[in-house]
Amino acid sequence: MSDKSIKMQAKVLKMFSTDKYELELLENKVIIKGHISGKMRIHKIRILPGDIVDVEISPHDLSNGRITYRHK
């Protein structure tokens, strides 16, 4: 995404497949859809419901995001 993307933290609510998730933003409790970034897919980083993750959201489409980091 561009440098204008919105970076937020979210909690994973549901896992639809290995790379599609339903996320709840921690700041304002909004539910969005998210997918994992390419680097996370390459390194086989697994994300489970309940995990806290960093999400980049495009200002053009606020209902979809990209998961860039999983907090330990």
UniProtKB/Swiss-Prot annotation:
A GO CC term assigned to this protein in UniProt: cytosol
PROSITE patterns: S1_IF1_TYPE
SUPFAM superfamilies: Nucleic acid-binding proteins
Molecular functions per Gene Ontology: ribosome binding; rRNA binding; translation initiation factor activity
Keywords: Cytoplasm, Initiation factor, Protein biosynthesis, RNA-binding, rRNA-binding
InterPro entries attached to this UniProt entry: NA-bd_OB-fold, RNA-binding_domain_S1_IF1, TIF_IF1
Primary subcellular site in the record, as a coarse category: cytoplasm
Ranges for domain S1-like: 1-72
Alphabetized Pfam families for the sequence: eIF-1a
Cell compartment(s), UniProt: Cytoplasm
Oligomer and partners: Component of the 30S ribosomal translation pre-initiation complex which assembles on the 30S ribosome in the order IF-2 and IF-3, IF-1 and N-formylmethionyl-tRNA(fMet); mRNA recruitment can occur at any time during PIC assembly.
Family designation: Belongs to the IF-1 family.
HAMAP family: IF_1
Cited function: One of the essential components for the initiation of protein synthesis. Stabilizes the binding of IF-2 and IF-3 on the 30S subunit to which N-formylmethionyl-tRNA(fMet) subsequently binds. Helps modulate mRNA selection, yielding the 30S pre-initiation complex (PIC). Upon addition of the 50S ribosomal subunit IF-1, IF-2 and IF-3 are released leaving the mature 70S translation initiation complex.
Name of the protein this chain belongs to: Translation initiation factor IF-1
Organism: Mycoplasmopsis pulmonis (strain UAB CTIP) (Mycoplasma pulmonis)
Gene: infA
